[in-house]
């Protein structure tokens, strides 16, 4: 007998199952009861519930439905192989192995018919066939009977050809044509003829809410119900047949006895039969439910046709809150069309203190988690009967939230700490998986600085060569200092530019080993090897570990680079695992799953006798497509709140259910590239899989499963918290449904739009972009913030005698080193953070200095310019310097290196000539003067030209930092000595002259910049590159005044914005982390402030300098 139980309460299902077990005990008490569930989470919940309710949970065997059916089929099909001939990978390898199919696929992808592409197509076609075997067995049957599927000839012709080739290939190999679809069909036929072996069937089976269930599975269960009792528990939001189904449909199923074939014909037919009419009527006659439970309704229709008996497990919901009233309305199908006055008269008042259902709108993921944490603390503090394990948090895409969950929940104070467990692991984030992929991908990578640095982040590799965490920074320093790029000399043999070995590992090792014996002095080298002797004994030992790691990786790179037979890959993969992982690591659940998938891929190909050699890259790609995530059901109900990915715990009751990330893209948007050939898409039927419709149904069931509180959060796009926009459709439906049956203010009760505003203001909460924004403290919040820092800030606001923003204490007058003053004015904002606040922000990107094989980077170029100029000035041998840079690897050891060196000499020679023209005898002078209110300025002025003035040069283009540095030195010179011009020279024939100043004027300016230093150490001075470029464009250097022309002003503004925003080649100033702390959004007010600051500090410089060119 097939007994259908309908309810929404999962605990009622388990109670009903045990009522049967207790009232009808099995003859053999040792026989196990069979429970069929969807997932491990449901299995664990049932075990815990039984153990709590009946004190013991034993003698129960849990199955997934497909595995249960497969076990029964094996008992009745002696020829059924343990490994299916029509599994996903078996079909894929058959497609790859059959020459006719390869030729056909080559025509389909004529634009790109590489072997890699054909491999991907075979995998996609295999996925399609798996769908057909499950949801379109009639198509498979027609193909095998050599008949066409109506209206799909062009789309299905080549698929039919491939399928028939697979069937022929299988027959030729003397293997039975036993795919799952055929096995189900044949077994159902046998049961109809009473030829089915039922001796090993269980006496009864209990099936708990298997959704979605395909018609073929349902008919099979109906068929075996002749031999054993089938108890099917179906969780549904509406279980009253008289409300769900039309009178004609109820009469039809009561008067008609429908065979299995008739059932299938009703499903397969596209004519408007009773099922399709019923679905259409349901969608027409409902408003709310038709949006949410269409998929469930289709399932209910079919189950109602095959069941022998229906038991409705009724229950009552206490109606004490908005959530409970809403649940009751939905369960009683209160959206069936009624007269407006009937709805209005039955509206229910929502109390202002009712927080049982609320919706929270946030701008960012981290803000969502902050709001989640605060709301949970608020509820838990107010409800002592709610334990941590009574809380369930669901997300459709938990991966994106996990970093923020760990950050927010783990950083809470001990008083506000909430223990949590995440019932989900994305396999692709598992360390074992990432390490395996890195190792398998060795043939496709070059072991340069970037890659080696990345590999040092993999704990498994570090453990292999005994590198600890403290040694990693040292290794990174070693890698950058030694400038080693490539792993061996063989790579260079195919280099068309030339044979540069200065940065390969072997040459690098020679430098380091030589450095242990010979010192690197005065740019000397030995046999074209420059010794590297900056290693201490500790560094040298650590570097030896790195050598061991690189040697091991090179060994495996060589092994994995060559294509191999599948049997060889099977052995090689086992050796790879044993070489890098311990037995314990290989036995972890995640590792076992990955190893199992790899083995399945390899062994399926070996079973199909694939005899060609194959690269490991193709196997790696298939492995990446095969693994997804693993659930961690052992962490469920362990005294912590549970974070759950997707709706795996739907229908399991929790006191608090919180749904995060409920945006319009809640359903999966991933589309297979072969969707255009998918016959399910071309001719959809009832009961076809549809993520979007199914997720709507699961969302509604989740709402109905919450006992006390149901919260939703989503993201909005707008940064304006006052503007409510982008409300997801699902949330909008819930709000409007509540408006239809509930009200806040009696005066707006009968006006839908006014009532809608009242409802929104009560249940819909729109949060600010940041937790610390002023609005959070000035307004009375329904959901207080428990973050310790935020509370301290709020306390400051609430106390009127304290200021919310405090100024830093003033710096007392003190002795200042002149170099400190210059350092400040080179970058006032950064110096404020470094010196005043002691804050260092990371401004470097994840790039390495020496990653290019043949070209020199800017820093090395500057160092080389500076050293070459020094050699010129001291009349030293520049050829030796050239050879040194080639041997050390700064300059490529090829023709490009010669070109770079000639370019450098051409750049520096004019600079040297100009210096020698101006330079006389250069002197240095120490000073210590009182400049302002007992503030002593001390230091040393260098390179004072005997002919008068300062002489400064820079072996690169002159920048603002060079100009302001020389300007401050010039002010000091004019304050101390006679009036003379000072000169600053740069490359590209640049020369800047600083005009001589009166002693009084120079002191005035110097005091002004010293005062600016003190002010800037209390409140940052907005002296930015954008402002500097703006003032250079707006200042008329010839006439020493600012342009007033509108076009000039507009052009200067464009230059300002270009510098601020940057482009594809130059990073914008807005990306500077220090400036980001000062200017979050660039407003007109900020721009004017930058203009004003730039004018104040740079105008004196522009008025007292001149630009010229030297020859």
Curated annotation (Swiss-Prot):
Family, as annotated: Belongs to the RecC family.
Signal peptide extent: none
CDD domains (UniProt xref): RecC_C-like (cd22353)
Protein name in UniProt: RecBCD enzyme subunit RecC
GO CC annotations, alphabetized: exodeoxyribonuclease V complex
PANTHER family, sorted: RECBCD ENZYME SUBUNIT RECC
SUBUNIT field: Heterotrimer of RecB, RecC and RecD. All subunits contribute to DNA-binding.
Molecular function as annotated in GO: ATP binding; DNA binding; DNA helicase activity; exodeoxyribonuclease V activity
Note: In the RecBCD complex, RecB has a slow 3'-5' helicase, an exonuclease activity and loads RecA onto ssDNA, RecD has a fast 5'-3' helicase activity, while RecC stimulates the ATPase and processivity of the RecB helicase and contributes to recognition of the Chi site.
Gene Ontology BP annotations: double-strand break repair via homologous recombination
Keywords associated with the record: ATP-binding, DNA damage, DNA repair, DNA-binding, Exonuclease, Helicase, Hydrolase, Nuclease, Nucleotide-binding
Function: A helicase/nuclease that prepares dsDNA breaks (DSB) for recombinational DNA repair. Binds to DSBs and unwinds DNA via a highly rapid and processive ATP-dependent bidirectional helicase activity. Unwinds dsDNA until it encounters a Chi (crossover hotspot instigator) sequence from the 3' direction. Cuts ssDNA a few nucleotides 3' to the Chi site. The properties and activities of the enzyme are changed at Chi. The Chi-altered holoenzyme produces a long 3'-ssDNA overhang and facilitates RecA-binding to the ssDNA for homologous DNA recombination and repair.
């Amino acid at each position: 007998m097939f007994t259908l139980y309908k309810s929404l309460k999962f605990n009622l299902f388990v109670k009903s199952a045990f009522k049967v077990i207790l009232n009808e005990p099995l003859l053999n008490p040792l026989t196990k009861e069979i429970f069929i569930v969807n997932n491990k989470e449901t299995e664990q919940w049932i075990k815990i519930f039984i153990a709590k309710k009946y004190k013991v949970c034993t003698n129960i065997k849990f199955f997934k439905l497909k595995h249960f059916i497969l076990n029964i089929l094996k008992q009745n099909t002696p020829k059924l192989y343990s490994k299916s001939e029509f599994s996903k990978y078996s079909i894929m390898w058959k497609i790859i192995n059959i020459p006719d199919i390869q030729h056909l696929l080559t025509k389909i992808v004529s634009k790109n018919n590489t072997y890699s592409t054909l491999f991907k197509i075979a995998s996609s076609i295999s996925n399609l066939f798996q769908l057909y075997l499950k949801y379109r067995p009639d198509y498979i049957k027609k193909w095998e009977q050599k008949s066409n599927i109506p209206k799909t000839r062009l789309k299905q012709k080549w698929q039919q050809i491939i399928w028939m080739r697979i069937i022929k290939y299988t027959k030729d190999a003397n293997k039975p044509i036993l795919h799952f679809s055929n096995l189900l069909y044949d077994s159902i036929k046998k049961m109809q003829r009473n030829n089915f072996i039922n001796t090993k069937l269980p006496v009864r089976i209990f099936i708990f809410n298997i959704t979605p269930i395909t018609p073929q599975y349902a008919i099979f269960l109906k068929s075996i119900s002749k031999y054993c009792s089938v108890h099917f528990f179906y969780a549904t939001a509406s279980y009253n047949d008289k409300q769900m189904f039309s009178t004609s449909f109820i009469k039809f199923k009561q008067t008609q006895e429908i065979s299995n074939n008739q059932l299938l014909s009703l499903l397969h037919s596209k004519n408007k039969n009773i099922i399709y009419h019923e679905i259409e009527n349901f969608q027409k006659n409902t408003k709310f439910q038709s949006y949410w439970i269409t998929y469930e309704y289709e399932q209910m229709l079919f189950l109602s046709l095959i069941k022998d008996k229906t038991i409705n497990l009724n229950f009552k919901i206490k109606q004490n809150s908005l959530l409970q009233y809403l649940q009751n309305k939905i369960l009683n199908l209160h959206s069936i069309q009624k007269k407006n006055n009937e709805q209005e008269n039955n509206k229910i008042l929502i109390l202002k203190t009712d927080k049982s259902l609320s919706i929270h709108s946030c701008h960012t993921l981290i803000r969502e988690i902050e709001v989640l944490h605060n709301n949970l603390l608020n509820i838990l503090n107010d409800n002592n009967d709610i334990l941590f394990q009574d809380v369930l948090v669901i997300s459709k895409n938990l991966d994106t939230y996990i970093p923020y969950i760990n950050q927010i929940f783990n950083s809470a104070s001990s008083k506000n700490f909430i223990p949590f467990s995440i019932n989900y692991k994305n396999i692709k984030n598992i360390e074992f998986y990432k390490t395996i992929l890195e190792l398998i991908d060795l043939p496709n990578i070059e072991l340069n600085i970037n890659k080696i640095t990345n590999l040092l982040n993999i704990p498994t590799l570090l453990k292999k060569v005994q590198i600890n965490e403290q040694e990693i920074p040292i290794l990174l320093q070693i890698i950058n200092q030694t400038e080693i790029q490539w792993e061996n000399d063989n790579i260079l043999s195919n280099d068309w530019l030339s044979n540069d070995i200065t940065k390969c590992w072997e040459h690098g090792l020679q430098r380091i080993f030589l450095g242990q014996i010979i010192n690197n002095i005065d740019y000397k080298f030995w046999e074209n090897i420059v010794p590297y002797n900056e290693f201490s004994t500790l560094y040298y030992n650590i570097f030896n570990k790195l050598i061991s790691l690189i040697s091991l990786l090179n060994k495996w790179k060589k092994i994995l680079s060559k294509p191999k037979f599948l049997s060889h890959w099977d052995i090689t993969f086992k050796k790879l695992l044993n070489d890098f992982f311990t037995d314990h690591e290989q036995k972890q659940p995640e590792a076992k799953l990955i190893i199992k998938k790899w083995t399945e891929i390899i062994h399926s190909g070996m079973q199909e006798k694939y005899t060609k050699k194959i690269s490991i890259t193709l196997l790696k790609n298939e492995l990446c497509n095969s693994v997804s995530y693993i659930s961690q059901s052992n962490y469920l109900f362990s005294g912590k709140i549970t974070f759950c990915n997707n709706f795996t715990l739907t229908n399991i009751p929790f006191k608090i259910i919180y749904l995060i990330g409920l945006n319009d893209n809640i359903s999966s948007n991933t589309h297979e590239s072969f969707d255009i050939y998918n016959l399910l898409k071309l001719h959809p039927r009832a009961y076809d899989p549809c993520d979007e419709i199914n997720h709507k149904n699961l969302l509604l069931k989740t709402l109905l499963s919450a006992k006390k509180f149901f919260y939703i959060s989503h993201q909005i796009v707008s940064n304006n918290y006052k503007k409510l926009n982008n409300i997801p459709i699902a949330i909008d439906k819930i709000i409007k449904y509540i408006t239809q049956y509930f009200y806040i203010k009696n005066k707006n009760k009968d006006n839908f739009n006014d009532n809608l505003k009242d409802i929104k203001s009560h249940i819909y909460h729109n949060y600010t972009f940041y937790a610390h924004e002023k609005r959070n403290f000035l307004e009375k919040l329904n959901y207080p913030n428990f973050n310790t820092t935020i509370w301290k800030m709020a306390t400051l606001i609430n106390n009127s005698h304290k200021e919310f923003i405090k100024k830093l204490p003033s710096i007392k007058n003190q002795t200042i080193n002149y170099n400190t003053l210059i350092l400040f004015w080179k970058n006032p904002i950064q110096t404020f953070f470094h010196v005043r606040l002691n804050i260092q922000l990371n401004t470097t990107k994840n790039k390495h200095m020496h990653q290019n094989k043949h070209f020199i980077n800017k820093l090395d170029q500057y160092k080389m310019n500076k050293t070459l100029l020094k050699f010129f000035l001291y009349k030293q041998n520049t050829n030796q310097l050239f050879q040194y840079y080639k041997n050390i690897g700064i300059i490529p050891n090829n023709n490009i290196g010669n070109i770079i060196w000639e370019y450098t000499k051409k750049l520096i020679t004019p600079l040297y000539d100009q210096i020698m023209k101006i330079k006389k005898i250069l002197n240095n002078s120490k000073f210590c003067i009182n400049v302002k209110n007992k503030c002593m300025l001390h230091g040393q002025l260098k390179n004072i030209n005997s002919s008068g003035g300062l002489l400064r040069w820079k072996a690169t283009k002159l920048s603002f930092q060079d100009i302001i540095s020389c300007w401050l030195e010039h002010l000091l010179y004019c304050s101390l000595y006679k009036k003379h011009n000072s000169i600053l020279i740069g490359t590209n024939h640049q020369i800047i002259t600083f005009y001589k100043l009166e002693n009084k004027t120079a002191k005035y300016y110097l005091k002004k910049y010293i005062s600016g230093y003190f002010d800037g150490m209390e409140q940052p001075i907005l002296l930015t590159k954008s402002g500097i470029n703006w003032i250079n464009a707006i200042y008329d250097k010839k006439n020493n005044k600012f342009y007033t022309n509108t076009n000039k002003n507009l052009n200067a503004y464009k230059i300002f914005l270009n510098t601020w925003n940057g482009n594809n080649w130059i990073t914008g100033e807005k990306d500077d982390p220090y400036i980001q702390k000062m200017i979050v959004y660039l407003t007109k007010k900020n721009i004017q402030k930058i203009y004003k600051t730039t004018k104040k500090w740079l105008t004196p410089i522009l008025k007292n300098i001149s630009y010229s060119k030297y020859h």
